[in-house]
């Protein structure tokens, strides 16, 4: 790869991240949590510039998270990019008991449904709502309101799902990591979470677990965004 950093060597699984911002942190935290849960040896590489040619060759979308890992025979380098893909890769490669990825086709399909819904709906909708609300130089009230309205529709779907008997999380255990960043505030701008009590409860429950607290900075030794290049 052109201009590949000399200190980057794929000896074990490498998770690529960027220094945390309001919109970049959560996607990389999710595979990190799953790696920790499964006890997978790994390194974290903090990318200085995602537009660099060497990184574009790894992920043409120029975003994190990205995983690189040697193939079992050591001949090839495997890669996964986008947060949903990295979660599925980790589960396929390391979750031999199906604890997080599902123990059969039915459970795996259920998990993948909710992961894909997040990727296609709530994730990008919330990202662009936040962008137009906070960062876009020109205020566009109709655009902001449309995105906010779409977010409430998607939260309604989550709340109904969690209202089903015995449904503590959206799918099998894996899916709890997709929801770990929800609802740290009851209201933000004109978007309030008071009506989504089950979503809030599930988010708070997950956010208090050690595997979630640690990557979010509760343990400074394992902060997701270290000053060094790798862990």
From Swiss-Prot:
PROSITE patterns: GST_NTER. The keyword Transferase applies. InterPro entries: Glutathione-S-Trfase_C_sf, Glutathione_S-Trfase_N, Thioredoxin-like_sf. This is Glutathione-S-transferase. Keywords: Allergen, Transferase. Conjugation of reduced glutathione to a wide number of exogenous and endogenous hydrophobic electrophiles. Residues 15-98 form the GST N-terminal domain. Its EC number is 2.5.1.18. The keyword Isomerase does not apply. Belongs to the GST superfamily. GO terms for molecular function: glutathione transferase activity. It catalyses: RX + glutathione = an S-substituted glutathione + a halide anion + H(+).
């Amino acid at each position: 790869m052109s201009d590949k950093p000399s200190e980057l060597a794929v000896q074990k699984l490498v998770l690529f991240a960027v220094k945390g911002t309001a919109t970049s942190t959560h996607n990389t935290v999710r595979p990190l949590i799953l790696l920790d849960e499964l006890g997978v040896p790994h390194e974290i590489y903090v990318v200085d510039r995602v537009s660099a040619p060497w990184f574009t060759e790894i992920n043409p979308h120029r975003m994190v998270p990205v995983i690189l890992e040697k193939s079992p025979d050591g001949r090839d380098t495997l890669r996964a990019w986008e947060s949903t893909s990295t979660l599925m890769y980790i589960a396929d490669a390391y979750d031999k008991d199906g604890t997080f990825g599902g123990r059969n086709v039915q459970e795996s399909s259920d998990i993948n449904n909710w992961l894909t819904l997040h990727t296609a709906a709530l994730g990008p909708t919330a990202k662009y709502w936040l962008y137009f609300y906070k960062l876009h130089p020109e205020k566009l009230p109709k655009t902001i309101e449309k995105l906010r309205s779409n977010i409430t529709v998607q939260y309604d779907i989550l709340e109904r799902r969690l209202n089903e008997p015995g449904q503590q999380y959206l799918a099998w255990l894996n899916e709890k990591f997709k929801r770990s960043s929800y609802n740290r505030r009851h209201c933000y701008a004109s978007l309030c979470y008071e009506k989504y009590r089950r979503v809030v409860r599930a988010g708070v429950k997950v956010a208090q677990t050690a595997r979630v607290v640690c990557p979010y900075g509760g343990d400074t030794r394992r902060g997701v965004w270290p000053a060094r290049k790798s862990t």
